[in-house]
């Protein structure tokens, strides 16, 4: 797990600071924004995956693609890093700039999380196809 905190005086008080949260290998995992005004997180954040495999756990939703990419990092790193940067750019550009309710902040966190899960799921499938005959 890794996180970055950012005090954001240029954002409305309802948004406030942002915790950019990631799991597994922080160099490979997406950052999910959690705002000071957030009151709910996606369900998968409450499921522990440290000692058992659970595909509904946030950890395992990113770990599978991360591990596959690591095995052949020389051939995956450029595309992988492009997807991380695109995800982070989209997440930053969508941060609410006006006064918003906690429900909107919750929905934005969920939206960024859902987009990241979909991207990492696509990468996992891509890597299984790429490496099906062996690593």
Q: At which residue positions do the language-model features occur?
A:
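C-terminus-biased signal that marks the final domain/tail of proteins
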Residues: 1-135
